[in-house]
Amino acid sequence: MEPIAQPYWHSVTLDRDACRGCTNCLKQCPTQAIRIQSGKAKILKERCIDCGECIRVCPYHAKQAATDSLSMLSDYDFRIALVAPAFYGQFSKTEDCDLILTALLQLGFDDVFEVARGAQEISLETRRLLAGGELMKPAISSACPAVSRLIAVRFPNLIHHIVPLRSPMELSAEAARREAVQKTGLSPQRIGIFFISPCAAKATAVKSGTETKKSQVDGVIAMKDVYLRLAQKLSHIDRPLPLSKAGSLGTRWANSGGEAEGSKAARRISVDGIHNVIQVLEDIEDDRLSDIEYVEALACPGGCAGGGGQPFQEGMELAGERGETLYEIDRNNPVRFSHENASVQKAYDDFFDKPLSHRAHELLHTDQTKWSLR
């Protein structure tokens, strides 16, 4: 897959009128991408990795993540909500994934597709790559686009350590469109895929086409923009549709540690929070983690459950509570690992053949050295 030729697009934006020049963002930025000029913050685009740390620490809400509006749904004949695993964590007293997915259909979507399904396919492929000794160790997960760009900006010598697999988001978007074409008979262009996103970095990955010339995702909608509307509908649904097909470890990708557990690597570590990630990358660069097989690195505190595109309450993110909701889903789901999931097995039977096959390489693998990360 070849990289795109257009300039790198950033989702993190600054409202200069709201900025008070307090320097909170400058102090916390992990790549020194912020300066204070004439009493206002300025974002240096060539350094910004869209991790959302500045959004998290700004007391004046001057930093925002640019996403799309639900009004975009009207541009398509058939609309699919591509649901990130972290979305389930928003509803602390609801561990029924089917209920949440059914409610999305009442917001104007015609179908739903769980990114956790794609995550489990990537987990299975990762396990085979690790077992076959085909990865430079320690292998670093490619799931977090903020971490991938961080490596490109600050640790370019580690790019070859990034696992050369597509993101679950892009893989799931492709599968969702394929299934919709078969179901509706519509042309692919008339089907809209909308990612319900927990963070700024994934919006950037879509708009910049990090992995490919053009993302399979047509629009990115922040979780906080649909949360209240959807929460109001949950209590009015008596019979949820059986829509969830993901195993619980696919859903647990939203927690720090879930992806690493799914990899089944014997020597693995999980790190979350961008400053902690930097420390681990420095350790890898200094060859202090040579005995580790696999590193799951997530920019947001607590993992995607702590992403900056999610609802806030009283100024504090509820990453821990969201994570506990995801753990509860894990405990209640009898299907955990990829090899136990019928939808993952069907995907391999129908499209990928078997792990590490020629067909799997063609559809699941990528060359991370050619990604558009700068």
Residue ranges and their predicted role:
Residues E2-R16, R20-L44, I49, E53-D68, ...:
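Iron-sulfur cluster-binding cysteine motifs and their immediate structural context
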Residues Q64-R374:
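Iron-sulfur-associated redox domains of electron-transfer enzymes in respiratory
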